[in-house]
């Protein structure tokens, strides 16, 4: 599985070597029996942007023992880099699920393992996240079915059950609870702004869009006083300029509260 396929509309040469390494890392661990299913999202979901990470969803046949979990997370850390810190590596986000935990679909579903750069300091300190219920899998699997390339096996829309709209909306409602006051988004302002625009898009359309596409959609629907916040976040995401959202705390909070209110109108509290 470590040889990444190339075909029209699939994985770019730019990330193929890194993807091959990540898949090899997963295969190397004897406790992991990959069920022939791996999907990559960010590389095709609107194309790679300057600070885009690589989102990989892998289905395995069996649960991980603790030794395998620790070894895998340590090795994945070596195949990833924080955005902008490496000329050759992008940040990777790996979500690993056990086949029988998500097929047939049930909500909320369980994830076996997740790796991302935000975990680096914890992993270095010997703190390893266990398997857990993850409401976000409803969103992640919807994204995979709409915007992904299968590295091994059939397409995601053939492999995964559709996520019912009521489960998607429940996951969107729960996600909104993450952001209630300024400490909740401090240091992550741009991502929170862009994520809220995506949630708003999904709440209205029932579909998933790339961050910049959702931002364009949302800007057209925002009152004029809130548009500069989202425009600044979008331009920074595209590498066109740096954002200074952290210095605009009041405007940022007003934007977040407005968009959350619009989302709640669509999906309920």
Swiss-Prot record:
Superkingdom: Bacteria
GO biological process terms, semicolon-separated: response to antibiotic
InterPro entries given in the database record: AadA_C, NT_sf
Keywords: Antibiotic resistance, ATP-binding, Nucleotide-binding, Nucleotidyltransferase, Plasmid, Transferase
Pfam family, one: AadA_C
Function: Mediates bacterial resistance to the antibiotic spectinomycin and probably also to streptomycin.
Residues spanning the signal sequence: none
Catalytic activity, reaction form: streptomycin + ATP = 3''-O-adenylylstreptomycin + diphosphate; spectinomycin + ATP = 9-O-adenylylspectinomycin + diphosphate
The protein's name: Aminoglycoside (3'') (9) adenylyltransferase
Coiled coil regions in record: none
EC number: 2.7.7.47
Gene Ontology MF: a single term: aminoglycoside 3''-adenylyltransferase activity
């Amino acid at each position: 599985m470590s040889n990444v396929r190339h075909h029209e509309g699939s994985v770019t040469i730019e990330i193929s070597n890194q993807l091959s390494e990540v898949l090899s890392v997963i295969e190397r661990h004897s406790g992991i029996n990959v069920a022939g299913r791996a999907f990559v999202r960010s590389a095709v979901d609107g194309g790679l942007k300057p600070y885009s990470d690589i989102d990989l969803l892998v289905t395995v046949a069996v649960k991980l023992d603790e030794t395998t979990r620790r070894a895998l997370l340590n090795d994945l850390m070596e195949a990833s880099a924080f955005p902008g810190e490496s000329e050759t590596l992008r940040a990777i986000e790996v979500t690993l699920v056990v086949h029988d935990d998500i097929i047939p679909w049930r909500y909320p579903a369980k994830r076996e393992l997740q790796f991302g750069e935000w975990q680096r300091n914890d992993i270095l300190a010997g703190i390893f996240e266990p398997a857990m219920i993850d409401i976000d899998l409803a969103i992640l699997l919807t994204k995979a079915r709409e915007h992904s390339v299968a590295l091994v096996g059939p397409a995601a829309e053939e492999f995964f059950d559709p996520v019912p709209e009521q489960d998607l909306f429940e996951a969107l409602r729960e996600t909104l609870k993450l952001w209630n006051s300024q400490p909740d988004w401090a240091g992550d302002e741009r991502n929170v702004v862009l994520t809220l625009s995506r949630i708003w898009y999904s709440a209205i359309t029932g579909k998933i869009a790339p961050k910049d596409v959702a931002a364009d959609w949302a800007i057209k629907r925002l009152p004029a006083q809130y548009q500069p916040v989202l425009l600044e976040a979008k331009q920074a995401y595209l590498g066109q300029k740096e954002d200074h959202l952290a210095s605009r705390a009041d405007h940022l909070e007003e934007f977040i509260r407005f968009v959350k209110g619009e989302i709640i109108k669509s999906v309920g509290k």
